[in-house]
Each structure stands twice: as structure tokens, then as C-alpha cells.
Design a protein with these regions (language model features):
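Non-catalytic substrate-recognition/targeting regions of SAM-dependent transferases
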Residues: 5-24, 29-96, 103
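Conserved SAM/SAH cofactor-binding pocket of Class I
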Residues: 106-133
Length: 133
């Protein structure tokens, strides 16, 4: 199993009661996650001082509530830069667990000895791109 453990700008800080508290660069977000089935106390400071909270609707979907969060911002993973933006369906336009795949194809590109183009199907929005710093 490959583990995405090289992040400096992303981390799951805590999770409880169907939600996870994440740090995306300098901002913290709370988003629902159906895999979080435990009900532990939400003692981390970030639960009270988040920058964005996605509230799931009982009818499906949901909406964001923002606290001092810009419309979009950037985070970095090694030599890659990503633009983030909260979407109406809880996502930010980036799947951090894909970092192991980025590491793998970054090595392949470096060793190809020729220019390479990559289509990132995990980031389909025109503003969500990665580039060398």
C-alpha cells in the first residue's frame, strides 16, 4: 500500500460524528465523510475555529458556511501548485490521497527524456491545475 505522507500543506486533523476536520494550507475546513462512524469528543481547537463548514442537507447535497475564507487559494505538494475552491457538493477540487500517484508519474515524466503531457481526470475544473513552481 502506498501512503500519501509527504504533505506539508494538507492534513486530516481530527474526525468524529460523520465529519472530518482538515487543514488545506492555512485554512481549516469541516466536511462530511460517511466513513467516519465513530462518535468521539470534538476536542481539537479547529472544530470551533474553522474557516469553512459544509452542512449536508437531509434532502441531498448541502451548502457551505464560510468564516474568513477566500473564494479560492493555493496549496503546494512538492513541486506542484494547486488552486482550491469549495464546491457546492463539498469538494475542494483536489483529492490529497492521489499524491502517491503524482509521485509515481512525476518520476516517470522526469525519466522519460522527452516532453510529456498529462491529463488529470481527478481535477476537471478549468481553474484547478498543477504546474511547476
Amino acid at each position: 500500500m502506498w501512503i500519501a505522507d509527504q504533505w506539508k500543506d494538507y492534513e486530516v486533523i481530527d474526525c468524529s460524528k460523520g465529519e472530518k476536520l482538515e487543514r488545506w494550507g492555512q485554512y481549516t475546513l469541516v466536511r462530511p465523510d460517511p466513513q467516519v462512524i465513530w462518535d468521539t469528543p470534538k476536542t481539537e481547537r479547529g472544530w470551533k475555529h474553522m474557516n469553512g463548514h459544509y452542512h449536508r442537507s437531509k434532502k441531498g447535497g448541502g451548502e457551505w458556511e464560510f468564516f474568513s475564507l477566500p473564494e479560492q487559494w493555493q496549496i503546494h505538494y512538492k513541486e506542484l501548485t494547486f488552486n482550491l475552491k469549495p464546491f457546492s457538493f463539498k469538494h475542494t477540487g483536489l483529492f490529497p490521497e492521489q499524491a502517491t500517484n503524482w509521485d509515481w508519474f512525476s518520476e516517470k515524466i522526469r525519466n522519460a527524456g522527452r516532453p510529456i503531457k498529462v491529463l488529470n481526470l481527478f481535477c476537471l475544473h478549468r481553474w484547478c491545475y498543477s504546474r511547476s513552481r
